[in-house]
Amino acid sequence: YIRTILKEALYVALEKAIVSGSGKDEPVGLNRDIHEGVSFSTSTGYPEKTAIQVTNFLPANYGPLVAKLAVTEKGRMRSFDEVLMICNQVDYLNKIMPATTALTTGGTYARDLFPFPTEVVRSNEVKTGQAILCLPEEYFFGLGESKDGKIEYSDEFKFLQDARTYKIKLHGNGRPYDNTVA
């Protein structure tokens, strides 16, 4: 039971780091502005990206939004077949699901209908009213351990109270390839 709880806590921390990590003593998240020349604060890390307002998912609006991911900061073209949209559960149910769900002629609902193939992932780490459109294969996260971390325990610390102390460790770091990944 303890090991499962520690692993879940580790997974939540990894999710937070990948989505919204500041880059200061933690990985750089997808929502951070890392373009060349941006100032890195020693107290708060990288600043958050400036949000782009999206009012609908019509091809004329969604296409240019996805096209921003197709060119790297150095001007090279990037090829991809699908993008990932990360949003929180409330925004998915209130905004994205109603805009991308349609009733089929067979009487069933087809969901997540986007003009460009898009996988929607829900994360509690994304702020309400925001979403992240990204290319997950362009985010590098290197681990020094297995993804489950390393669980250690000690009976020495609280020997007299007959209690065992557990801790979990994971060494890793990650960052997007460049500022155009998300």
Regions found by a protein language model. Name each.
Residues 1-68, 182:
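Alpha-helical scaffold segments that mediate packing/assembly in large oligomeric complexes
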Residues 46-87, 95-103, 108:
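Extended alpha-helical or coil "stalk/linker/tether" regions that are enriched in polar/charged
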Residues 4-8, 81-84, 89-182:
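Sequence/fold signature of self-assembling virion shell proteins
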Residues 22, 28, 36, 44, ...:
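Feature targets compositionally biased, intrinsically disordered low-complexity regions
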Residues 15-19, 23, 75-82, 175-179:
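Intrinsically disordered or highly flexible coil/loop and linker segments, enriched in small
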